[in-house]
């Protein structure tokens, strides 16, 4: 009897330790109810502020949060609610890439997001974290993220600029800017300066190929590198099909 009781207590203790360990290394199990509560509220705020840019639509916001969720698994110390809020609200102010105040958009989005969150009784102690994560997510703003939450959001947003979806977003955005697909005679810019404002294909080498090296987390870098190969392979194939040899 004593032996059975001892074994039962040991099993219960082991289960408790496993549960504690899981809680430590998987923060979503502790915060899931809070995230579930806030996700529809954040979606409502984000949807109300969306424009007509399909490269920065609600699907983009969902993908950024999905990417961030993957990175959060590697960073249990991060505040998942701060990351979720910044993931969904980072584009509340979204100026075109050729707009003269594009570099200010993330600061404007951060200020608007914090005002709206405060009105929704979002935890006040988390607002500064959300503000910083939104301000520093932008490539155009060129602001360094100083918190793990901001690093995760920046990586998550930039990962969506890579891979097959990133490629589609690239050409969609280029069309909105009236850019040509590629330079007629030199698509790979072998004998000319890169110009991604004039030629969509140039954007891969000008910016996107550099993103993996700028990732803030190891997990983000690994995801970015795996997706970059899709763009570089496309660029090579595109150039082969695009360049037409002069008739003999």
Language-model region placement:
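Polybasic, lysine-rich low-complexity intrinsically disordered segments
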Residues: 4-5
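Aromatic (phenylalanine/tyrosine) cluster motif
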Residues: 25-28
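Divalent metal-dependent phosphate-bond-processing catalytic cores, especially two-metal-ion Mg2+/Mn2+ enzymes
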Residues: 32-33, 49-76, 89, 142-248
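An active-site-proximal "capping" alpha-helix that borders the catalytic cofactor pocket
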Residues: 64, 105-117
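His-Asp-centered metal-binding catalytic motifs of divalent-metal-dependent phosphohydrolases/nucleases
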Residues: 80-99, 105, 109, 130-138
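Hydrophobic, well-structured mid-protein blocks that either form specific transmembrane helices
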Residues: 116-149
């Amino acid at each position: 009897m004593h032996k059975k009781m001892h074994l039962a207590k040991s099993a219960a203790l082991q289960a408790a330790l496993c549960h504690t360990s899981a809680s430590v290394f998987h923060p979503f199990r502790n915060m899931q109810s809070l995230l579930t509560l806030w996700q529809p509220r954040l979606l409502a705020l984000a949807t109300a502020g969306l424009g007509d840019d399909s490269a920065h639509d609600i699907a983009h916001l969902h993908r950024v949060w999905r990417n961030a969720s993957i990175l959060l698994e590697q960073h249990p110390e991060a505040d998942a609610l701060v990351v979720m809020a910044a993931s969904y609200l980072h584009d509340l102010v979204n100026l075109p890439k050729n707009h003269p105040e594009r570099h200010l958009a993330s600061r404007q989005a951060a200020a608007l997001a914090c005002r709206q969150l405060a009105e929704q009784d979002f935890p006040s102690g988390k607002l500064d974290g959300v503000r910083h994560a939104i301000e520093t997510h932008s490539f155009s703003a060129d602001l360094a993220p100083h918190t793990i939450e901001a690093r995760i959001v920046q990586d998550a947003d930039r990962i969506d600029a890579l891979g097959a979806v990133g490629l589609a977003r690239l050409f969609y955005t280029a069309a909105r800017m009236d850019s040509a697909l590629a330079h007629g005679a030199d698509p790979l810019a072998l004998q000319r300066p890169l110009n991604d404002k004039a030629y969509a294909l140039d954007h891969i080498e000008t910016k996107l190929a550099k993103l993996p090296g700028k990732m803030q987390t190891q997990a983000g870098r690994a995801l970015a590198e795996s997706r970059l190969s899709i763009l570089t392979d496309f660029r090579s194939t595109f150039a082969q099909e695009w360049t037409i040899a002069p008739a003999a």
